[in-house]
Amino acid sequence: MIQPQTYLNVADNSGAKKPMCIRILKASNRKYANTGNVIVAVVKEAVPNMPLRKSEIVRAVVVRTCKELKRNNGMIIQFDDNAAVIINQEGNPRGTRVFGPVARESREFNFTKIVSLAPEVL
């Protein structure tokens, strides 16, 4: 579960290293974001000479959470870190590669481009 002020890892090569969640989108009063939800984040650390800079406001999709994810078939999935993929206003990833596994729930939220770039879908 991701809440405001949570630091995440970036799972793509967009240039950001550590974004911090400042808002969960598509919910008026939601406190937590799970896998597949869109958040608004601020870049706290960035790679030099890349398009994304420090203190830039971006949108991101949560692709991995440390909190257990229960599926309808009874399977429970848990990742080692909280990670997100930086997206643009249309929902397409800003990077060209995605690192690490991605939860299958991203496909259900119509982020098929992120799922196709991922090396492993759990």
UniProtKB/Swiss-Prot annotation:
SUPFAM superfamilies, A to Z: Ribosomal protein L14
A GO molecular-function annotation: large ribosomal subunit rRNA binding
UniProt entry keywords in alphabetical sequence: Chloroplast, Plastid, Ribonucleoprotein, Ribosomal protein, RNA-binding, rRNA-binding
Main location: plastid
Alphabetical GO biological process terms: translation
Annotated Gene Ontology cellular component terms: chloroplast; cytosolic large ribosomal subunit
Cross-referenced Gene3D superfamilies: Ribosomal protein L14 (2.40.150.20)
PROSITE patterns with a match to the protein in the record: RIBOSOMAL_L14
Subcellular location per the Swiss-Prot or TrEMBL entry: Plastid, Chloroplast
NCBIfam families, per database record: rplN_bact
PANTHER family on file: 50S/60S RIBOSOMAL PROTEIN L14/L23 (PTHR11761), LARGE RIBOSOMAL SUBUNIT PROTEIN UL14M (PTHR11761:SF3)
General function of this protein: Binds to 23S rRNA.
Subunit comment: Part of the 50S ribosomal subunit.
Annotated family: Belongs to the universal ribosomal protein uL14 family.
Protein name according to UniProt: Large ribosomal subunit protein uL14c
Annotated source species: Huperzia lucidula
Lineage, opening ranks: Eukaryota, Viridiplantae, Streptophyta, Embryophyta, Tracheophyta
Gene name of the record: rpl14
